[in-house]
Design a protein with these regions (language model features):
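Cytosolic juxtamembrane N-terminal segment immediately preceding the first transmembrane helix
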Residues: 1-37
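Extracytoplasmic gate region of multi-pass secondary transporters
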Residues: 42-43, 249-307
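Extracellular/periplasmic helix-loop-helix junction of adjacent transmembrane segments
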Residues: 43-72
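Interfacial helix-cap and linker-helix signal at transmembrane-aqueous boundaries
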Residues: 49-50, 80-81, 165-173, 282-283, ...
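Helix-breaking motifs and short loop linkers at transmembrane-helix boundaries and internal kinks
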Residues: 54, 85, 106-112, 140, ...
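Conserved MFS/SLC helix-loop-helix module at the cytosolic interface between two early adjacent transmembrane helices
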Residues: 72-110
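Glycine-rich segments within core transmembrane alpha-helices of 12-TM secondary carriers
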Residues: 145-171, 185-186, 386-396
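Central mid-sequence intracellular linker of multi-pass
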Residues: 175-238, 425-447
Length: 449
């Protein structure tokens, strides 16, 4: 390495979290909060909208069109981000889904609604993979996992507050007000990002972009670093060539990529299956309407707390043992939900713990995907895994709807536990694959020619 070379990777790894990085985390977190708000608020808007339009049922179709858009957007815009950068894609996607959400407030027919929600979903799909990737790339090594988990939990926070905001707005201003709110806030966030959000320093270095721009943002990360006009910037990886989605399977990554996809698919089919049907099934178990709604709330609350709580254990013990515990524990808790004789208090606790495992596992899935791939494939890798997972999120509610009249409640939740168990197995296998790859890399590095 040249005497005037500055290693970007090591500088960020060894830095402290300063106000500049916190600003990056906050902006990315706000994007994810509004992402979660947009997806979840539809469930609260639908009854008022369909009453006004005189439609009996189409909520599932609208939700599915949004999720299909998210699935496609996760893949397409993630590949684009690995070509042109995280910053332009995040800003563009935020302003894009802001505009489409505002347009949603003006639709007058079901066909218009279906089309607009699909198109809006394309932009929503770009947010999670690029926000998580950028946060990881600006985080010091010792706090990277926690930063990615906290920021990705913004989606869960947004989903949780959607109900409160929609409940306040709809009776006073009508269902359209929810979309006005959901479109205006990301517009402001997008403008703030345009002013303050930096590009990934690793990306800029690998793409051989302006040294002055790299120096400007690197100084914000580590003010004490000595830079001169002759400074050259390097990272601890090489630029990868080829079609990004195909390259995910190169250099020994094929098995790991497929296992990541399996983890995302199984967990998201479970998450959306339970989020959609828990209150309805609880009502069928004999609970009062208020108690049945509380079951769904406990699931989301457990998820919000668990998504942050697993950060320290992962930093101490690593991803794989913690995620196996999350998914394995969730499988047990889900199986217990349908057990006869479960008291209401016990049901709330079991559902809370199931939500903890499922949502915490999802946050962990996103973080481990971001650490698995190199910079030039990071957004594509996270986005592709989420895109495959979104297939599960689309199928989940329909699978539950098909199974519900054919199985007893006890049998139903035993079946619901299977995806969590498969997620735990996939995590264990991925851990073995990554440990074997790390051992081989270390052996190669220490071999003397």
């Amino acid at each position: 390495m040249a005497a005037n070379a500055i290693n970007i990777t090591e500088t960020i790894d060894n830095s402290q979290v300063r106000s500049f990085q916190i600003g990056v985390f906050v902006l990315c977190g706000l994007c994810l909060i509004m992402d979660g708000f947009d997806v979840q608020s539809w469930g609260f808007v639908a009854p008022a909208l369909f009453t006004e339009w005189g439609i009996t049922s189409a909520a599932g179709r609208v939700a599915s069109m949004t999720l299909i858009g998210v699935m496609i957007g996760s893949l397409l815009f993630s590949m684009l981000a690995d070509k042109i950068g995280r910053r332009p894609v995040l800003i563009g996607a935020t302003l894009y889904f802001s505009a489409l959400t505002l347009i949603t407030a003006r639709v007058t027919t079901l066909d218009q609604l279906l089309i607009i929600r699909f198109i809006a979903g394309l932009g929503l799909g770009a947010i999670m993979p690029n926000a998580v990737a950028l946060v990881g790339e600006y985080s010091p090594k010792q706090s990277r996992v926690m930063a990615m988990l906290v920021v990705s939990n913004g989606f869960t926070v947004g989903a949780a507050v959607a109900g409160f905001i929609a409940t306040y707005l709809i009776p006073r201003f009508g269902w359209r007000s929810v979309f006005y709110f959901g479109g205006t806030v990301p517009l402001v966030i997008g403008l703030l990002m345009f002013v303050a959000l930096p590009e990934s320093l690793q990306f800029l270095t690998l793409k051989k972009k302006s040294g002055d721009l790299i120096a400007k943002w690197l100084k914000r990360v580590e003010p004490s670093i000595a830079l001169t006009p002759a400074s050259q910037f390097v990272v601890n990886e090489e630029k990868k060539e080829g079609v990004p989605i195909v390259t995910l399977f190169h250099e020994g990554r094929a098995t790991g990529t497929l296992l990541l996809w399996t983890m995302q698919f199984m967990n998201l089919i479970n998450l959306y299956m339970l989020s959609t049907w828990l209150p309805t099934i609880a009502r069928g178990m004999g609970l009062a309407a208020t108690a049945a709604l509380m079951v769904g709330t406990m699931f989301q609350t457990g998820g919000a707390i668990g998504s942050i709580a697993i950060g320290k254990p992962i930093e101490k013990w690593g991803f794989f043992g913690v995620l196996i515990a999350c998914f394995g524990g969730a499988a047990v808790m889900i199986a217990l939900i349908g057990q006869p004789g479960l008291t209401k208090s016990m049901l709330f606790v079991v559902v809370f713990l199931a939500g903890w495992g499922i949502f915490a596992g999802q946050a962990g899935n996103n973080a481990v995907a971001a650490t698995y791939y190199p910079t030039t494939l990071r957004s594509t890798g996270v986005g592709a895994a989420l895109g495959v997972g979104r297939i599960g999120s689309i199928l989940g509610p329909y699978v539950a709807e098909y199974m519900r009249p054919r199985y007893s409640t006890h049998q139903l939740f035993l079946v619901f536990a299977v995806p969590a168990l498969l997620s735990a197995i996939a995590v264990g296998l991925l851990g073995m694959v990554m440990n074997r790859a790390a051992t081989a890399k270390a052996a190669k590095a220490t071999t003397i020619p």
